[in-house]
């Protein structure tokens, strides 16, 4: 921890008991929005999570809410670039033995055995180590699964610098596109372009903002959050083992009613350091 981070921590903990948790959440979301927003004020909402791996669950939960009776197809690009936790999450499994509240969960077990994802991993490289073009494979999977609700999980600026061809994103389709920018090796303008296209963006405070590990956020374009807030969200109740009602925006009442109202003081502190 740097001296600056130590001072932020000391000040934050000293006043924490006087703060409204709900107001603190909104304040941090607004500060994050101000950091990444363009001059055109891209309309998006902030969904918090305790780690980058937890962010992987969000689009899967969203598609379950919007299409509860459809197969859930998760197309995951560059699995070699992902941590083991993100792979478990991509398969709608618990990726750890404890959740953000310290409760014991079963690593590797399905979060909800009744609603699971069908995952297609698309390798980043061939056997000789050459970077593969995954665009054709992504398009083929989507075309061959018209009966499925689809999540397209792409990377851009990965740990080894791999970048998916973002032209594969079809803004007119019902595919829910997500781009992992957790490493944040990109220009700010890319975030604005993605949000404008309706693409969800994954960020982690520990990478881009140089904060302590385990603080993450999903930037969700308003086109999705407006639809999500109007549907039955009871299908996500099992994800109360991972998320708090406070992780989602205040106006997502349909989601909040199926998640526990648990505060995470440490997560708020990590974001406070990240946003300082």
Regions found by a protein language model. Give the residues of each.
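Substrate-binding/gating loop at the entrance of the active-site cleft, primarily
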Residues: 74-117
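Conserved active-site segment immediately N-terminal to the catalytic lysine
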Residues: 192-206
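Active-site C-terminal subdomain of aminotransferase-like
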Residues: 206-276
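Active-site phosphate-binding strand-loop segment of PLP-dependent enzymes
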Residues: 110-181, 185, 208
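Conserved N-terminal alpha-helix of the aminotransferase class I/II PLP-enzyme fold
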Residues: 2-54, 58-70, 79, 88, ...
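Structural motif
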Residues: 75, 151-155, 178, 202, ...
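Short, charged, surface-exposed secondary-structure boundary motifs
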Residues: 85-86, 187-190, 209-215
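Gly/Ser/Thr-rich loops at beta-strand to alpha-helix junctions
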Residues: 47-57, 79-84, 156-162, 182-185, ...
